[in-house]
């Protein structure tokens, strides 16, 4: 079995992105009999698609779990659905701000995650990790990557399972925000990393 985990480079003025660390820390490890491949995607429309599709074609993973940062969220959020739309609130890392455009013209309006999202949430709760099912992955790069991965599954037959998980800020990202209005929530990096490992374990159990 092969599992792909993707994260993103920093964006929106942030110096770090915990999902970049997650992808790098999981790259090369084994969970059960599965080999994990971690890759970091650019926060750039077009380029992210190129890197993602090339990675999927090279690795041909059985499972793809894409991870993104969701500033303001206080728990692990497991995304239910990706929609065929881009409506960026902020520019990407090359200054492009795409609004009201489809991700794949003529493709389905939306795809549901093929990960066992309720089982993942239940297992996270058992491990003491706060998590919930989210019904919106936004309309930026996270939804973009989730949609493209599921579209690849639908048209190419792999990965067999694909979905997206959002994580909150980590504490070190909050320091420079203190004294500048309401301090956003955060979660320790170790818990976020463990959450992704749990998601992999549950997905693997579902496929076996």
From Swiss-Prot:
What Enzyme Commission number(s) does the record list for this chain? 3.4.19.3
Q: Tell me where in or outside the cell this protein is found.
A: Cytoplasm
User: Cross-referenced InterPro entries, in alphabetical order?
Assistant: Peptidase_C15 (IPR000816), Peptidase_C15-like (IPR016125), Peptidase_C15-like_sf (IPR036440), PGP-I_bact-type (IPR029762), PGPEP1_Cys_AS (IPR033694), PGPEP1_Glu_AS (IPR033693)
Superkingdom assignment: Archaea
Could you list this entry's UniProt keywords, alphabetically sorted. Answer: Cytoplasm, Disulfide bond, Hydrolase, Protease, Thiol protease
Biological process annotations from GO: proteolysis
A single GO CC term for this protein reads: cytosol
Which residues does the Swiss-Prot or TrEMBL record annotate as the active site? 79, 142, 166
- List the GO molecular function terms: pyroglutamyl-peptidase activity
State how it assembles: Homotetramer made of two disulfide-linked dimers.
Spell out the HAMAP family in the cross-references: Pyrrolid_peptidase (MF_00417)
- Family classification: Belongs to the peptidase C15 family.
The name of this protein is Pyrrolidone-carboxylate peptidase
Species of provenance: Pyrococcus furiosus (strain ATCC 43587 / DSM 3638 / JCM 8422 / Vc1)
Originating gene:
pcp
């Amino acid at each position: 079995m092969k599992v792909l985990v993707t994260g993103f480079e920093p964006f929106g003025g942030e110096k770090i992105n915990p999902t970049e660390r997650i992808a790098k820390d999981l790259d090369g490890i084994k969970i059960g009999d599965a080999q994990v491949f971690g890759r970091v995607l650019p926060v750039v429309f077009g380029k992210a698609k190129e890197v993602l599709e090339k990675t999927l074609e090279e690795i041909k993973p059985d499972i793809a779990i894409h991870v993104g940062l969701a500033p303001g969220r206080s728990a692990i959020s497991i995304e239910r659905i990706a929609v065929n739309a881009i409506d960026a609130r902020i520019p990407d890392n090359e200054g492009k701000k795409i609004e009201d455009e489809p991700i794949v013209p003529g493709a389905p309006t939306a795809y549901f995650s093929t990960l066992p999202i309720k089982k993942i949430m239940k297992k996270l709760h058992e491990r003491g990790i706060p998590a919930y099912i989210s019904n919106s992955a936004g309309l930026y790069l996270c939804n973009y990557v989730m949609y493209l991965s599921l579209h690849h599954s639908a048209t190419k037959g792999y990965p067999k399972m694909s979905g997206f998980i959002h994580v909150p800020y980590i504490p070190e990202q909050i320091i420079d925000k203190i004294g500048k209005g309401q301090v956003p929530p955060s979660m320790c990096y170790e818990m976020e990393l463990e959450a992704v490992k749990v998601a992999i374990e549950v997905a693997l159990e579902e496929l076996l």
